[in-house]
Amino acid sequence: MNISPTPKRYNSRGDRYYASQARGKVPEFEPYRKSGLNFNDGYSGINPPVYKNGLHSNLDDDKLVPEEIKLQRTVINDLISQNKELQTTVHTQREEIERLNIIIGQFRAKLTKYSVMNRKLEDELRGSERSSNALNKDRNDDRNDSILENSFENAEDYIQIPKLRYNSKGKQDKSPQTNDLNDRLSQLVQLLEKSQQNNSTKINSNSNDMSPPVCSSATPPERNNKPIMSSPKIRDPSEEDILCQESAELKSLENQIELVKKKLLIKRENELRKLSLENELIELMDQLSTDASPYRYGKSKGNFISTSKHEKHDENLSDIYGDYTGKNSLRKHNIKPFNPIKMDNILETPTPPNRRNSE
């Protein structure tokens, strides 16, 4: 059986209408039936055609539409376009703000990283400066010791000259010049011996702080074969060293102050917490006492009797008849006085008075 569509389905007028409507063009043709109801008429009121954006394509050219509606349409379109533009600008600004926030976070992380690195490097620099100062001090001490050791004159370094012994029989020629020279030499030898003794005593007493001995310029050139080096002076602390030391002391003081402040804050918080807990405990104890006092148990009626009424009645009777009538009134009503709760055993389960009496 052939199920292929008939040619009428392809060539029908309705198919042409819907195909042209999909393309955006509505063909003008007569209605399907010649009646008063035209379904393809835009102003018939029954099933009007639906156009793009719910409006007629030729609304501006239509004469039946008033001009106010046309103006409103243009204004609304302008507002919609402006709203879209503003939304796009807001969206772009938000994206820029997010991007800037990301950049700020990266810079903050880098700042913290480099600050930590800077602190570590400063600590290392201070440690290296201390070690270098200690090494320089040790070197200076060693150099001073070596200079002092070299400055002492050994007996082996001198040229031993035999003394001239004059015969008693021979003639001794003594001139005043030779006598003066001999006296000067003897004085110089004595001075050198004294200086060597003083230096030896100083070395034994203070081995760390040594200064080279002052050599006299009047010594003979034969004995001063070795040049005496002057001891290097110890370097004085510079302004940078003083500032670094002061900054370190200030930082240590600031850290101590912060620790003391933290301890004081913790102490105050603990005191306030203690006071608040004590107040809560007092309030809870008052609530327990008030919850237990307003009711008493009566044997005659077998139910709870409020104590406030009886207390008022007893007060009135005591005013009239005295304390004796108040006690008798309690006996007449068979009401036992309330036993106060002991505060030692607050957490125990309460037992009714009937069971207590039975026990």
Curated annotation (Swiss-Prot):
It is found in: Nucleus; Cytoplasm, Cytoskeleton, Microtubule organizing center, Spindle pole body. GO terms for cellular component: cytoplasm; nucleus; spindle pole body. It holds the Pfam family Spc42p. Keywords: Coiled coil, Cytoplasm, Cytoskeleton, Nucleus. Residues 123-145, 195-238 are annotated as: Disordered. Forms a polymeric layer at the periphery of the spindle pole body (SPB) central plaque which has an essential function during SPB duplication and may facilitate attachment of the SPB to the nuclear membrane. This is Spindle pole body component SPC42. The gene is SPC42.
